[in-house]
From Swiss-Prot:
Protein name: Large ribosomal subunit protein bL27
Family, per entry: Belongs to the bacterial ribosomal protein bL27 family.
Lineage: Bacteria, Thermotogati, Thermotogota, Thermotogae, Thermotogales
InterPro entries: Ribosomal_bL27 (IPR001684), Ribosomal_bL27_CS (IPR018261)
Keyword Lipid biosynthesis: no
Species of the source: Thermotoga maritima (strain ATCC 43589 / DSM 3109 / JCM 10099 / NBRC 100826 / MSB8)
Amino acid sequence: MAHKKSGGVAKNGRDSLPKYLGVKVGDGQIVKAGNILVRQRGTRFYPGKNVGMGRDFTLFALKDGRVKFETKNNKKYVSVYEE
């Protein structure tokens, strides 16, 4: 029974795909209804005026207009103001 025990298996070799999170439009930029403004995990930014929030916390424009980033009560809000 002169067998050699099999060697271990490499424990590396995995890599997850990028999630492409972050702010997608700048302050003062003009957007159309449905445009994605922020992709995030959790509420780093809260929806303000004319902005909706998806199931995965994505913020998107509900109306055409200009993007405005605002801070109220230590919370960051993203709003869209019609022109």
